[in-house]
A protein has these predicted regions:
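N-terminal Sec/SRP start-transfer signal
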Residues: 1-34
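Extracytoplasmic
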Residues: 57-59, 103-108, 119, 136-138, ...
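Hydrophobic secondary-structure segments that place a key small or acidic residue at a functional site
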Residues: 93, 130-203
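Hydrophobic, regular-secondary-structure patches
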Residues: 35-109, 116-119, 125-137, 146
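Soluble periplasmic/extracytoplasmic beta-strand elements of cell-envelope proteins
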Residues: 61-65, 90, 107-112, 142, ...
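Mechanotransmission and gating elements of multispan inner-membrane complexes involved in transport
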Residues: 165-167, 174-264
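Alpha-helical membrane-interface segments at transmembrane helix boundaries
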Residues: 13, 29, 44, 48, ...
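Structural motif
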Residues: 62, 84-90, 151, 214, ...
Length: 264
């Protein structure tokens, strides 16, 4: 018998003495500590899994960006759809706007989605807590639960939307009317950063707001095997011509995922 086992047993069960209270406390203390550790680890693993799932669902598996506005995005999207790893592709544009309902202004992130191809890549319909995906058109908006609560709006409410371009022109004493959008849906993704301050409009609406013309900021991809997103993104990134580059959802949230690993 190893010497440390021998001394441990001698301390727990001294020769010639009955089972001691201290031995019982020691054994139960270790058992309780291990049990608590297992429970905490199980809860954390479930928590991390839910967050990772929310991140993947709201970001898409892989995104293709451009260091400049993407003009020929239709050709790029068609080429990507030819790859066997890719199941669906949709364009996107994004920015920051000021929205106002009555006297209350808010500055949420705005996402522009193509209603035809967006739902093939992102499960927008499953995020909706009010409204229907068919209600999203060029004169309507979906708002996150955080935006709805902070502005006190619901289905049918009207929002005045201003972009930085509009605000800049207003400084030049130009009279510009805001874009009036009707709230057609309220969504919740489970990812606080999105749910706290995000609105969703059609791609055409965002292109109009930001003066993009037919250009977009990038493409979002859904893969046949989402688990291969990091590997596929690296491979695609090496093959794409400049100024295009690819990032997986894990790359885009690398810092946050690192913090989650530390928490575990």
């Amino acid at each position: 018998m190893k010497w440390y086992f021998y001394w441990a047993l001698r301390q727990l069960f001294p020769a010639g003495r009955p089972f001691s209270f201290f031995a019982l406390v020691s054994i139960l203390g270790v058992a309780l500590g291990v049990m608590v550790l297992l429970i905490v680890q199980s809860v954390m693993n479930g928590f991390v899994h839910d967050i990772r799932d929310s991140l993947a669902r709201t970001n898409g598996d892989v995104r293709v960006f451009s260091s400049a506005l993407l003009d020929d995005w239709r050709e790029v999207a068609a080429d990507l759809r030819e790859r066997e790893e890719v199941e669906a592709v949709t364009p996107f544009a994004q920015g920051i706007v000021m929205v106002q309902e009555g006297p209350r202004p808010l500055f949420p992130q705005v996402w522009g989605m193509d209603p035809a191809t967006g739902p093939e890549v992102l499960p927008v319909d499953s995020f909706l807590v009010a409204g229907s995906l068919e209600d999203l058109d060029d004169r309507s908006v979906f708002v996150s639960t955080g935006v709805a609560n902070r502005l006190g709006v619901g289905i049918g409410s009207d929002l005045d939307v201003y972009t930085p371009l509009m605000l800049e022109r207003m400084k030049e004493e130009e009279v510009l009317l805001p874009l009036d959008l009707r709230v057609a849906g309220i969504f919740e993704t489970g990812w606080n950063e999105v749910d706290r301050s995000t609105i969703l409009v059609t791609l055409r609406t965002l292109q109009e707001l930001y003066g993009l013309g037919d250009r977009v900021h990038g493409l979002t991809l859904r893969l046949a095997d989402p688990e291969k997103a990091p590997v596929f993104a690296r491979t695609l990134d090496a093959e794409l011509p400049e100024p295009l580059f690819a990032r997986s959802w894990m790359d885009l949230n690398e810092d946050f995922l690192f913090v989650l690993r530390l928490e575990k």
